[in-house]
């Protein structure tokens, strides 16, 4: 009897050789690697996708806020530099410089812009309208404008640092009449003189002063002669009858020590240039040299 051998194609699967099927879950999982891409996305993946899309603009917003903060800091620093070294606004609180500058305790005073650069390269000249820190002898009776409350005072100092609140010092505004080395004097027969020459002062207004210089040449008490020490200036208000200026601070009608009545040039903050407020008063603060003579 001849044995016959079945060909591989005719061999039937036996118990030891299970038939391979693509439907077998194990085989299918190994062969079709792309199945997850074809499957429908579940709720979690959709939520993650939406969250990612929602979060995309946030870095841009943070960047914008950061840029804004940097620009704000730069602006404050530049403004502080300007106030400290270039120019600063000041409020006129009294009538001592009328009619050139308006001011009173119950009205809207002029706000002026003070140039701080001019006197870094030069010195005050006769006729200049200057803002200066009062010398110690001029500060008698001065009261601090700061609050006694620590928190409020801190806020005031911070605002003063950037120029929104006046500094806590006795800042005054007057016109320069004489400078170091010059001799100023006032007599009823000669009026106000510097180095013996009468002054020409078109900025004086008799109606404002309620006095006529032709009748009352000194517009107050006689004084002098006073020789202004080097490095100092003699100042007076344009409203002579309502101004506590150099005349009010020198002893014995200014015939003794000249220092108390004069102002150190080092105390000069700057030169008044412009009236910036209110709009109806916009204009230039002019320097008029009174020593041109009549």
Curated annotation (Swiss-Prot):
Residues 88-294 are extracellular. It is an enzyme of class 3 (hydrolase). The chain crosses the membrane at residues 67-87. Inhibited by 1-(2,5-dichlorophenyl)-3-(dimethylamino)propan-1-one (MD3). GO terms for molecular function: serine-type endopeptidase activity. It is a single-pass type II membrane protein. Residues 47-59 have a biased composition (Basic and acidic residues). Residues 1-66 are cytoplasmic. Residues 1-59 are annotated as: Disordered. It comes from the Bacteria. It holds the Pfam family Peptidase_S26. It is found in: Cell membrane. Gene3D superfamilies: Umud Fragment, subunit A. GO terms for biological process: signal peptide processing. Keywords: Cell membrane, Hydrolase, Membrane, Protease, Transmembrane, Transmembrane helix. Belongs to the peptidase S26 family. This is Signal peptidase I. It comes from Mycobacterium tuberculosis (strain ATCC 25618 / H37Rv).
């Amino acid at each position: 009897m001849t044995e016959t051998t079945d060909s591989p194609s005719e061999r039937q699967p036996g118990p030891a050789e299970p038939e391979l099927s693509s439907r077998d879950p194990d085989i299918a999982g190994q062969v079709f690697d792309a199945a997850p891409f074809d499957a429908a996305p579940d709720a979690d993946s959709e939520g993650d996708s939406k969250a990612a899309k929602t979060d995309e603009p946030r870095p841009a917003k943070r960047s914008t806020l950061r840029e804004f903060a940097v620009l704000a800091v730069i602006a404050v620093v530049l403004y502080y530099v300007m106030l400290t070294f270039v120019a600063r606004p000041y409020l006129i609180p009294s009538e001592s410089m009328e009619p050139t500058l308006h001011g009173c305790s119950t009205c809207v005073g002029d706000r002026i812009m003070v140039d701080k650069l001019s006197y870094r390269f030069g010195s005050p000249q006769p006729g200049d309208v200057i803002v200066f820190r009062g010398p110690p002898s001029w500060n008698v009776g001065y009261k601090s404008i700061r609050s006694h409350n620590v928190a409020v005072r801190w806020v005031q100092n911070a605002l003063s640092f950037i120029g929104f609140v006046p500094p806590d010092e006795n800042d005054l505004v007057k016109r320069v009449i004489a400078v170091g080395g010059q001799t100023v004097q006032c007599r009823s027969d000669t009026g106000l003189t510097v180095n013996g020459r009468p002054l020409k002062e078109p900025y004086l207004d008799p109606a404002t002063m309620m006095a006529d210089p032709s009748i009352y040449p000194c517009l107050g008490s006689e004084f002098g002669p006073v020789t202004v020490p080097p490095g100092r200036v003699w100042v007076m208000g344009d409203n002579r009858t309502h101004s506590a200026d150099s005349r009010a601070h020198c002893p014995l009608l200014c015939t003794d020590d000249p220092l108390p009545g004069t102002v150190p040039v080092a105390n000069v903050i700057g030169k008044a240039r412009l009236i910036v407020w209110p709009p109806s008063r916009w204009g230039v603060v002019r320097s008029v040299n009174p020593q041109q003579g009549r």
